[in-house]
Amino acid sequence: MFFALLFLIGILLGQVQGWSEPRIRLSSGALAGTDVILESGSPLQLVCEGDGPVTFLPRLAKHKRYISKEVGKIRSFRVEKTTVDFTGTYKCVYMNGNDSNLSSSVHVFVRDSRVLFVSPSTSLRYVRKEGEDLLLPCLLTDPEATDFTFRMDNGSAAPYGMNITYDPRKGVLIRNVHPGFNADYICCARIGGAEKVSKIFSINIIQRLRFPPYVYLKRNEYVKLVGERLQISCTTNNPNFYYNVTWTHSSRMLPKAEEKSTMEGDRLAIESILTIPSVQLSHTGNITCTGQNEAGANSSTTQLLVVEEPYIRLSPKLSSKLTHRGLSIEVSEGDDVDLGVLIEAYPPLTSHKWETPTSHNASLPENRFFNHNDRYEALLLLKRLNFEEIGQYTLNVKNSMKSASITFDIKMYTKPVARVKWENVTTLSCRSYGYPAPSILWYQCTGIRTTCPENTTDLQPIQTQTVEFQKESFGAVGVESVLTVGPNRRMTVVCVAFNLVGQGSDTFSMEVSDQIFTSAMCGSTVAMVVLGLLLIFMIYKYKQKPRYEIRWKIIEATNGNNYTFIDPTQLPYNEKWEFPRDKLKLGKTLGAGAFGKVVEATAYGLGKEDNITRVAVKMLKASAHPDEREALMSELKILSHLGQHKNIVNLLGACTHGGPVLVITEYCCHGDLLNFLRSKAENFLNFVMTIPNFPEPMTDYKNVSTERMFVRSDSGISSTCSDHYLDMRPVTSRPTNSALDSSSECQEDSWPLDMDDLLRFSSQVAQGLDFLAAKNCIHRDVAARNVLLTNSRVAKICDFGLARDIMNDSNYVVKGNARLPVKWMAPESIFECVYTVQSDVWSYGIMLWEIFSLGKSPYPNILVDSKFYKMIKCGYQMSRPDFAPPEMYTIMKMCWNLDAAERPTFSKISQMIQRMLGETSEQQDTQEYKNIPTEAEAEQQLESCDPVKHEDESFETSCDQEEEDQPLMKPNNYQFC
């Protein structure tokens, strides 16, 4: 209809312009009809004349070169010598597009006795879709040919149902083609009694698709965290190439997907991969993959959920036949119970485990676990439950970021059993256990009897008030009723306990008098008083016993200078630190304390498979308290949390499974800095004496020998062996093991100390403490005894709380229920129990005094008593140590500033010492030796402080929160003393 309308419009336009159809004639004259018949080799000249510019449209495009070049109202088509190829229809049209519907045509037959049919010079293979029409250009060169037929090339007739129309001027028209028509065909006709055939036409009909493409998504839902990468694969296939795949989202545009095409038998498979590099909350919704072909479209949809945080959600799934209230389940003996839990989790679960009352047994209940995308179902099958199997059943699950658990409490219906007990002269108690909770009734019968007969008038309920209370015991509920009777009574009582399951009873005969009551009451009272006093004394002694704890603390700043300590037990432990216990060979003990010890060990395969490394191993004693084991695990977690640094004793591994906890750290062969300084004191003095004009210092080290054995050191560990880890001299004449890791070799240190060494020790410790401060870690026990030395005299910070006998170490003073290194502590730590990085700076200043006095104890000749606390509170500072340059003493005084905010940072301290290290090669310290102030001098300095209101106060304060009456205590949130 539409094309007919266009044709009419074209005619009307031509009429409006006054044009008529162009006219075709032969050069020799007018046409006799619409056909022109020529012999092969004859000339052909057609002339077209119209009302405007015209041109010819020949059958073959290559014949356009025979059209005259001039453009005008008259055009000619001229061929000097024709062939059968010129057979066809020639059309004359206006060149103006508006007049394309005005045309004329003529058909030319070029006869040749050898050729009856002409065909296009292009391919004779025709491909059509099922249901379309197909025109085969099988043209006759002679209109007088007869007996035209159309058949297969093999001689068979055309297929049944083929609708054929033949026009000698156009060819064979096949309507509504079908895949059954696929074959090779020829046209046949007779001329002069002989049959002639055309070239072979090959027909290939593509079957019409009756079904949309197959579309498949592996998952019907996805869960992702914000920022994660999403990749969805959509698998499709189709019988041919004529289809496409698209992606759509319920609310937003999606990026272009990548496609991979393969052949699967006779079908084409396209895998479309949609990738979103970083999902956002707005991506939440339905994502659809659609495959479309001529038969229609097919799609598959998946749901995407984008969340901000990981999650684990647990919900119980219990049979409706079970009697339960929430997670509490009531069963009878011999029942079967299925405990089901529905789990939703992302990231995916990494582990799941049931904990049952019989987990210690070799045979556990049957459990099943099902997984579908990010949803799971855990099922525990309990068959024929008995009394030993009742209790709590807990499912623990975790993924890479969270953990969760759910607990079912199974209780078994139990018939009650009653037991009567004589508490004292006038009191009886009846206890019964059962489930549900039993009820108790008392009955009496006169006289002394073994039983009271039932259903008689002698058995009477006791009209007295009873007190009942419930308590859980092994899944059953315990009920106790107390009966009070008067003196001078002879009676038999019956206690009856009953519940839904049944009842139980017990009979008791009693004879009460006042004399028995008085003596029994007095004896019971005395015994209870003695036991109470003994219990109070034992609790006091137990609380006085110190517990092992790592001094290091991780903090987080909240508001200004207010800090909150992070519970180290909540820090994660990375299993990558686990080291095989069988590859660790323990050696001699390097140090031992009240809670544990440090031993030398050899680790095989640490770092690299063929490495043999000397290490130090921390462990607890066999009698260690569970709290102390948790403290060692906290130390392990803190060390793994901090990471590696050259100036701390670094964690190398740990053994936490299959035995006691072992913490593997670097081995520092030269022991602690305090004893190293003392052992090198004489050499240092000799070195100082060689400096021209250096006055002989009046020190306590004139008679120090390098071979001296320290029976008791400030480190707090008794030692008689020269190579003990804490109270040690440098290792001498140790056999060399070529198989050991070179980093673990210990060379004898025979070099004397010099000023550069003291400055380097100070700088390295400052760098280590700066690293700890950057990690929000407070050391709380900075002292020379807690610094170890490795090869090349590299200082490393450690914590010897495990292997130090603080009970017998004079450096640790009792305050409240703890022992603290008071002489190294900042005022705010002593008086307010506040520990910050600035309090570590104060302790570092004390450690500098130790270094530059070659290991002397700070505040010499001053006892830790009320006077000492008063001196500290009033700002007393030690004088410059024997060998400290003035610049270093300035740093010490900066560290001892009473205002914690005014103390320098470790980074600043490190920079100042580094500058001094650069100047020591050009300068010599000529400062004269200064004696340590005596206690009298300290008192004189104290008097200048003029304390007004603290003269009579005791400074033996405690950090225990219960002792709030102490005048120097201030309430705070940092009670770690």
Curated annotation (Swiss-Prot):
It catalyses: L-tyrosyl-[protein] + ATP = O-phospho-L-tyrosyl-[protein] + ADP + H(+). It is found in: Cell membrane. Residues 541-977 are cytoplasmic. The active site is at 781 (proton acceptor). Belongs to the protein kinase superfamily. Tyr protein kinase family. CSF-1/PDGF receptor subfamily. Monomer. Homodimer. Interacts with CSF1. It comes from Danio rerio. Keywords: ATP-binding, Cell membrane, Disulfide bond, Glycoprotein, Immunity, Immunoglobulin domain, Inflammatory response, Innate immunity, Kinase, Membrane, Nucleotide-binding, Phosphoprotein, Receptor, Repeat, Signal, Transferase, Transmembrane, Transmembrane helix, Tyrosine-protein kinase, Ubl conjugation. Residues 19-519 are extracellular. The gene is csf1r. InterPro entries: CSF-1_receptor, Ig-like_dom, Ig-like_dom_sf, Ig-like_fold, Ig_sub, Ig_sub2, Kinase-like_dom_sf, Prot_kinase_dom. The modification Phosphotyrosine is found at residues 563, 701, 725, 812, 929, 974. Its EC number is 2.7.10.1. Autophosphorylated in response to CSF1 binding. autophosphorylation, leading to its degradation. Ubiquitinated. Becomes rapidly polyubiquitinated after autophosphorylation, leading to its degradation. Residues 799-821 are annotated as: Activation loop. It comes from the Eukaryota. The chain crosses the membrane at residues 520-540. ATP binds at residues 590-598, 618. Residues 919-977 are annotated as: Disordered. This is Macrophage colony-stimulating factor 1 receptor. Residues 544-576 are annotated as: Regulatory juxtamembrane domain. It is an enzyme of class 2 (transferase). Disulfide bonds join 48-92, 138-187, 234-289, 430-495. Glycans are attached at residues 98, 101, 154, 163, 244, 286, 298, 361, 424, 455. Residues 1-18 form the signal peptide. GO terms for cellular component: CSF1-CSF1R complex; plasma membrane; receptor complex. GO terms for molecular function: ATP binding; cytokine binding; growth factor binding; macrophage colony-stimulating factor receptor activity.
